[in-house]
């Protein structure tokens, strides 16, 4: 196991999900978020050390689930917490590189509190590996239950590739 494994904790993994992005998907909720948005429905994921360590076995399970032909998945969703938290970047990038190499045709959606035009170089390198980014902090005053895949109207869905 590499050091990157110790760099990421996660709260929940769903091997089959139909809520967090289009189609049937795998969803990983990572730990660690600096935004601490008022009204967040995932407050338990804010601390980096919350949840449990993301291991090689967890990563292998995601790859196997994405390759599963009995329950075809359209792709992977990364949420949290925040997948683009600086301490999550190495492990998230490693996972996404494997998805790109081993799970052809699968798309990747990611939710982050960071704005696309404010990302660091390291965050941009991770975003280059995904298809869709939903960016922006959740703003309680802009909450709109009618929105699809967004909690508040300030958040933007970026179809990157």
Region spans (language model):
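Active-site beta-loop-alpha junctions enriched in small/polar residues
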Residues: 81, 113-115, 138
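Canonical radical SAM enzyme core domain
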Residues: 47-63, 85-127, 132
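P-loop/Walker A phosphate-binding loop and immediately adjacent motor/lid segment at beta-alpha junctions
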Residues: 86-100, 143-161
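Residues embedded in well-ordered beta-strands within globular domains across many folds
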Residues: 77, 131-134
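N-terminal [4Fe-4S]-dependent radical SAM core
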Residues: 1-29, 38, 42-49
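Short Fe-S-cluster ligation motifs
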Residues: 61-81
């Amino acid at each position: 196991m590499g050091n990157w494994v110790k760099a990421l904790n996660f709260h929940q993994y769903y091997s089959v999900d139909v809520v967090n992005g289009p189609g049937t998907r795998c969803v990983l909720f990572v730990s660690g978020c600096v935004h601490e948005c008022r009204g967040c429905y995932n407050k338990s994921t804010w601390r980096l050390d919350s949840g449990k360590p993301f291991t090689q076995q967890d990563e292998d399970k995601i790859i196997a689930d994405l390759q599963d032909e009995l329950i075809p998945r359209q792709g992977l969703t990364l949420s949290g917490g925040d997948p683009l938290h600086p301490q999550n970047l190495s492990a998230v990038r490693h996972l996404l590189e494997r998805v790109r190499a081993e799970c052809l045709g699968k798309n990747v959606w990611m939710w982050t509190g960071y704005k696309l035009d404010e990302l660091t170089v390291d965050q941009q390198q991770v975003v280059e590996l995904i298809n869709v980014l939903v960016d922006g902090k959740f703003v309680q005053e802009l909450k709109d239950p009618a929105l699809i895949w967004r909690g508040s109207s300030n958040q933007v869905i970026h179809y990157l590739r």
